[in-house]
Amino acid sequence: MPAVPKKVAGIFTLNLEEKLPTVDQALEKFDHTLSELSETAIKVVKVIHGYGSGGKGGRIKEAIRQELIYQRRTHIIHSYYAGEDLLPGKEAYQELNKQNPTIKNILTKDMLGNPGITLVILKRSYI
């Protein structure tokens, strides 16, 4: 993994699908990257985990969401939002915009309604 992963438009992109990892490899990369990010000023992370070829939800997506649900990383993560919930009118989208009013400036169209991503807001975030 490169020392400084991709960051575009105020959002750090963590691609967990790259090189078709196993679930364990993806979780390890997720853990390692979050540890690295805790040492930076990065505030928002777009986690690309895919949504599974069957359309039901991939194993990496499910594993990452389980990690976030149980908040095993509460020392780093403030909140997270499923890509499929990032749509105007959805409660999660409204909550995200209320807590982070400038987030609209960095969300891209490919993120809105995308079940293959999860948006993570780091605990120290003041966007």
What does each model-found stretch correspond to?
Residues M1-I127:
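Long, charged, low-complexity intrinsically disordered regions
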